[in-house]
Amino acid sequence: DRYMEVKKLLEVLTTAEHLKDVPRHCYTSGGRRESVAEHSWRLTLMAYWVSDEFPEVDLEKLLKMCLIHDLGEAFTGDVPTFEKTEKDEAKEAHFLTEWVAKFPSPFREEMQALYSEMEERQTLEAHIYKALDNLEALIQHNESDIDTWIPLEYDLQMTYGNDKVGFSKYLTALRDEVRNESKRKIAQKGSMK
């Protein structure tokens, strides 16, 4: 029986709401810092819109992975991937594990299973989620003003996520197009000097 008592639901939603105020490293096309919630929202849209490329995918599971993947950052904030250490990952996992353990059944077990599957990255859904997570960040960087990029991002836009898309021709093609957009953006910046 899937039921969450209303007070617990409001408590969970209040914690999740913090992601609206947790800034990510990247900027939006409008010039403000993107929030973790916005990243998760668009990642989920991406998963929905590419799902027809994967007829055997469990779409509900994939969408859930995308929705919950950064909930731990409600406790720790966002640490950019190029700065995140094992200690940062352990801290986020600790807070998330403690929080999820307080969920009522069956939500607790389902979320624990989803996080485990995402971490192990052995299923199609976990592979798609992780590839899209990387791609969404790259797309957002392309949509931001290049003046917000830090020097290392010029290289990251060429390489980040390459190791996550190889299982899919479609996602490889998407990664290639995102890289081409990055190259055009960099070339345009160079021609404006």
Language-model regions: role of each:
Residues 1-193:
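Alpha-helical, largely C-terminal catalytic domains
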